A protein has these predicted regions:
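Beta-strand-enriched cores of mature, soluble protein domains
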Residues: 1-135
Length: 135
């Protein structure tokens, strides 16, 4: 796999519902993307829903839009749906779907993509990096 780009995420809110068998986390966030082909910011409304049931792998599903400019200065928006599983060791691997409204960039996102979540060491403990890879 080859590194494609990173998305910097800042967690802005957290809500949880918990029972004896299931925990659901609702995480809101903002952030940005700095890639050679695109620079942009995550719009308000980004949310990650995580579900953890006893005896099953945890699941996550994040949806958000990044609005910015391509490397030629043209307005560009990316819709990202990032679904994945959390393993017992806490690592998370995802299968992102990315829809791009820029005809020149859109083919870049037609490849099989894989995402990995990387924690960022910061005092607030509210930041992660989503690393996107191509096959």
């Amino acid at each position: 796999m080859e590194k494609f780009f990173d998305i910097n995420v800042r967690i802005t809110g957290f809500n949880q519902v918990k029972t004896d068998t299931t925990t659901v986390n609702f995480i809101t966030f903002d952030g940005d993307c700095q890639a050679p082909f695109f620079t942009g910011k995550i719009l308000d409304g980004g949310v990650d829903t995580q579900k953890f049931e006893k005896g099953k792998p945890g699941t996550l599903s994040a949806r958000y839009i990044i609005k910015g400019k391509d490397s030629k200065g043209r307005d560009t928006s990316l819709f990202i749906e990032n679904n994945g599983f959390a393993s017992e060791d806490g690592s998370i691997e995802t299968s992102p779907f990315i829809l791009c409204d820029n005809d020149e960039l859109a083919p870049l996102f037609s490849k099989k993509l894989t995402g990995r979540i990387k924690n960022v060491d910061c005092p607030e403990k509210n930041r992660i990096i989503i690393e996107i890879y191509t096959e």
